[in-house]
Structure formats: C-alpha cells, structure tokens
UniProtKB/Swiss-Prot annotation:
Protein name per Swiss-Prot or TrEMBL: Phosphoribosylaminoimidazole-succinocarboxamide synthase
Recorded metabolic or biological pathway in which this protein acts: Purine metabolism; IMP biosynthesis via de novo pathway; 5-amino-1-(5-phospho-D-ribosyl)imidazole-4-carboxamide from 5-amino-1-(5-phospho-D-ribosyl)imidazole-4-carboxylate: step 1/2
One GO term of the biological process aspect: cobalamin biosynthetic process
Keyword Ligase set for record: yes
CDD domains registered for this protein in UniProt: SAICAR_synt_PurC (cd01415)
Source domain of life: Bacteria
Taxonomic classification: Bacteria, Bacillati, Cyanobacteriota, Cyanophyceae, Acaryochloridales
PROSITE patterns (alphabetical): SAICAR_SYNTHETASE_1, SAICAR_SYNTHETASE_2
Keyword Plastid: no
C-alpha cells in the first residue's frame, strides 16, 4: 500500500496516510523520551522491538474480544492501523504502586492494589498531562460520561487479559498506559501501542529491584542494559500464542 507524507510525528511514532482513507501507517521510532520529553535519547532497535511486541499484543487482545486499531504488521517497524480520532486521555491502570503514585501518596513501591487503580490524565504535554478528577473530566468534555464508563471497562478488561498473558511470560504487569480512539460510527477502539515504553514490567525471575526492570524505567533511571531488557520482553511475548 502506498505510503504518503507524514500526518503526525509524536515522541515514539510517525503516522502516515495511505491510499485507503480508512487505513494509516504507524512507523515506530528508536527515539526515547521521559518526563514529558525533558529527557531524550535513543534505544537501538526500539522501533522494531516495540512494533513486534505491540503487534503481537494487539492480536492477542483482539482474540480476547478487545477491539483495537491494529490491522497488520507490514514491516519490522511498521504496522497498518485503522484511522480513529484519538481521545485526548491517557488511561493508566495500576496493579502495584510504583512511579508517580508512590511519589505523590507515599505508598511503598510494589504494594498490591486490589482492585486495580484506574486513572485518567489529560493528554497534553504542555500542561504536564495532569491527573483528572471525574468533575474535571466532565468539565473538559473530552469524552461523554458513557464513553468514560466504556473506556474504564475496556481498560480493566485489557488489564485482566494482559496480566494473565505477561504472567505466563514470567513478567509482572505493574502498571501501564492506554489510549483510545473513536471511529466515525462512534465505536471506541483501543489505540496507540502496548510496549515496554507504555508498560511497567518486572521480571519474575529477578528479585533485585533494579535488575528486574524490563521497561522504560531503565532509561528514566539510567540503569543501562535497555536494549537487552526490551529484547527479553520481545522474546517472551513472541513465544506466547496470540490465541
């Protein structure tokens, strides 16, 4: 399918139009950013690894009944996706306390959260992606009350399936970020990506609090061995069936 000029370039992907107005091409980049792009760098082969991981996980979730924008992986670092209007929300699901939750609440790292915590953030780098209360969500009108309920339900369903998937890969899904989009029909689809860039993943074979980290925290915290961690996630994910 013909690739056209870029429609949008974000921190991790470039989005292109194609000959089909309903299909876009997502190209995954090796660029790495943290703290709302205040820290920048590059991770060798990250685009290829994240594309492979996301493609596999989108197929797995589709088999579990989670509708998403993935169509097909068409190159090592490229996938075709359905065109959606991205809802400007970042939806974070937390199974254990980590990251900003620990910093803002004083909860100890690794504290199990039962039920999982679901948080909505405004997708706006200039504002620092602020956490939204239900009233702020309603005030900003970025999604209807019905859409927010549906997105929350979908996020929890994704969490159930991905937690099981990663557990079978010997990995703990600590927390993760999701984005959603609207189809012209109003249907809500899971969008963006699922990868070590957007998930906090701990290796169950490691007890050391630094060695167990298999995600972008290795870049955030200057822990090194970033490529090796992403490669291990890719190896374990691709070895798991998508059905």
């Amino acid at each position: 399918m013909t690739q056209f000029s870029p429609l949008y370039e974000g921190k991790a992907k470039i989005i292109y139009a194609t000959a089909d107005p309903d299909v876009l091409l997502a190209e995954f980049k090796d660029d790495a950013t943290a703290f709302n792009a205040q820290k920048r760098g590059s991770i060798q082969n990250k685009g290829v690894m994240n594309c492979a991981i996301a493609s596999h996980l989108f197929q797995y979730l589709a088999a579990q009944g989670i509708t998403n924008h993935f169509i097909a992986q068409v190159a090592p670092n490229k996938m075709h996706i359905r065109r959606v209007e991205i809802i400007p929300l970042e939806v974070v699901v937390r199974n254990q306390a980590a990251g900003s939750l620990c910093r803002q609440t004083g909860l100890p790292l690794g504290l199990a959260l039962n039920p999982p915590l679901v948080e909505f953030y405004l997708k706006n780098d200039d504002l620092g992606d602020p956490l939204l209360t239900p009233d702020r969500l309603r005030l900003l009108q970025v999604a209807t009350d019905e859409e927010v309920i549906q997105i929350r339900q979908m996020a929890l369903a994704v969490n159930t399936h991905l937690s099981h998937f990663f557990a079978e890969c010997g990995i703990t899904l600590v927390d993760f970020k999701l984005e959603f989009g609207r189809r012209p029909t109003g249907e809500i689809l899971l969008a963006d990506e699922i990868s070590p860039d957007s998930c906090r993943l701990w290796n169950r074979d490691e007890s050391d609090p630094e060695k167990r980290i298999l995600d972008k925290d290795r870049f955030r915290q200057d822990l090194g061995a970033i490529e090796e961690a992403y490669a291990l996630v890719m190896q374990r994910v691709l070895a798991h069936s998508v059905s």
